[in-house]
């Protein structure tokens, strides 16, 4: 039976992890409402501008990103200025849209004390096209930041913004600046304010009464770069396969807290937990529709494992697949008109697509001995998945229009559970390449691999939209 049994069990409240509220203007806006204390954009000021800076000969612009200028000598303001500059450098590096001048070369450049004494000529000696200059000032309510991207050829700011907010999470200022800078300068939606969710056994607890003394797994979230890791569930049971709602406010996941697996939804800001599915059947592997109004999941309620779709409030349950074999691991197309999933209907598990109404079945993987965990790219062009490549698995991507497959990982441990970043330029995945299973991120070309978890073992990441 499907229902929305509302369990007001309070889960861990997540503080200062939302996106930033921005003034209205063309381009993507923050995906979620900001939590208390997040930096706010004041009304657009006459001096705030956005023009495009370019590199020489059509190359990517070369930028310098030194520490921000602390307009007060206290330790907190100084630390914030240093941290925002470093995190902004890291955020810009991650997107690979600019050529960053290494920070260890900045020692020869005199530090500016204000926007009026930026040593533009010295930055030009390092072949910079632009330098990001920012100031941090303490206020009664927190801090005030101003930032400019100065074109070293024209000495004019190509980008100018100001922000006010709490100093509780200074990383969020850097993430906000990075996303706005990429949007205005490169026409790109950045991912610095996005989140990851994953399941982890890091707490070291064991589930009593299980023959194998199974580890407790809880749901965690973090910033895209692995910072600000927070525990979401506190059930002391097995909680796995989390997935973000499109508004990045809720997480659906499979929980064994009542022995039989069912799907729960936790709102990370309200601290509530809802039980979407109930009963004696197995209900697992939830996937949100792009509009957030439905979830697809896997259930054996009618015998074997099939795909079902249900409204967010638990109403209007309908079956999508109907085959004697097992159909599992659904993922929605960005349009919401199709689903990709795994089925063993022709032998070993393979990736298929099907229309959301259950028609139009198509096999996607044709050359794999085993394919699992599909994830549809937000631009709709590709599906990433885990494929058997030997003793372990590797991440591959298939282009839907041509069927062309490219491999992203190559036998460094077992690599599974890919999940796309919302701009289709990066993927997260879990891998055993460093020993225990950990979460990694990489570019869509398989380059710039970075491990972002270390505590315990961590599995099945999902990137917020």
Region spans (language model):
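Hydrophobic beta-strand positions that form the internal "hydrophobic ladder"
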Residues: 196, 251, 292-296, 336-340, ...
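Multi-bladed beta-propeller domains
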Residues: 223-240, 266-284, 310-326, 354-372, ...
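Amphipathic beta-strand/beta-sheet edge segments enriched in Tyr/Trp
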Residues: 114-180
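Residue-level detector of Asp-centered blade-edge/turn motifs that repeat once per structural unit
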Residues: 190-192, 246-247, 290-291, 334-335, ...
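Short beta-strand->alpha-helix linker/helix-N-cap micro-motif
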Residues: 45-119, 132-138
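Structural motif
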Residues: 142-144, 205-220, 260-264, 304-308, ...
